[in-house]
Amino acid sequence: MNISIPQIIAAILNFIILLLIVKHFWFDKITAVVDSRQSEIINKIEDTDKNQKLALELKEKNELELGNAKKQGKTIVEEYKSKAENVYEDIVKEAHEEADRIIKKSRLEAERQKKNAEEEIRAEAVELAVLVSSKTLEKTIDDLEHRRLIKDFISKVGI
């Protein structure tokens, strides 16, 4: 194959003419598409950077809020634990007080029953003493005088 100088010059001229035609009709459109695509890519990269920074800020904020929530939860648990312990202590205190009241009431009731029993025993002792003494003396002293004598005797003896 023989390549001559006029062929090379013709090829270069054809290329320049083709380049001028392409530049005249399509170069602005191609440049606009490339520029718009380039600006889209730059905008997306900037948006991605902004979103990444925002995500990091939100992550830090959420971690801080989570830490605060944990602290508040712990505080609330401690507060309710303290309240529960106070309620427990109040219940135990009330139970002891109630037990003391019941014991005191029972002691008073026992003393009252003891006094009633002593009174009944005294009354029966007086009756028995009157009966025994009237049988042994075979004479009748008036009943009131006899009771008085027996009560004096019992009080001296200590029944």
Swiss-Prot record:
The membrane topology of this protein is:
Single-pass membrane protein
Q: Does the keyword Transmembrane helix apply?
A: yes
In alphabetical order, the GO MF annotations are: proton-transporting ATP synthase activity, rotational mechanism; proton-transporting ATPase activity, rotational mechanism
Principal location:
membrane
List the Pfam families hit by this protein, alphabetically.
Answer: ATP-synt_B
Against SUPFAM superfamilies, the record matches this protein to: F1F0 ATP synthase subunit B, membrane domain
Source superkingdom: Bacteria
InterPro entries given in the database record = ATP_synth_B-like_membr_sf, ATP_synth_b/b'su_bac/chlpt, ATP_synth_F0_bsu_bac, ATP_synthase_B_chain
- Print the keywords alphabetically: ATP synthesis, Cell membrane, CF(0), Hydrogen ion transport, Ion transport, Membrane, Transmembrane, Transmembrane helix, Transport
Membrane-crossing segments per the record: 2-22
Do you know which Gene3D superfamilies this protein is assigned to?
A: F1F0 ATP synthase subunit B, membrane domain
Is this entry keyworded Hydrolase?
no
* GO cellular component, as recorded: plasma membrane; proton-transporting ATP synthase complex
Q: Where does the record place it?
A: Cell membrane
> Which family is this sequence assigned to?
Belongs to the ATPase B chain family.
- What is its quaternary makeup? F-type ATPases have 2 components, F(1) - the catalytic core - and F(0) - the membrane proton channel. F(1) has five subunits: alpha(3), beta(3), gamma(1), delta(1), epsilon(1). F(0) has three main subunits: a(1), b(2) and c(10-14). The alpha and beta chains form an alternating ring which encloses part of the gamma chain. F(1) is attached to F(0) by a central stalk formed by the gamma and epsilon chains, while a peripheral stalk is formed by the delta and b chains.
Task performed by this protein: F(1)F(0) ATP synthase produces ATP from ADP in the presence of a proton or sodium gradient. F-type ATPases consist of two structural domains, F(1) containing the extramembraneous catalytic core and F(0) containing the membrane proton channel, linked together by a central stalk and a peripheral stalk. During catalysis, ATP synthesis in the catalytic domain of F(1) is coupled via a rotary mechanism of the central stalk subunits to proton translocation.
Protein name, please?
A: ATP synthase subunit b
Q: To which species is this protein native? A: Clostridium botulinum (strain Loch Maree / Type A3)
Name of the gene encoding the protein in the UniProt record: atpF
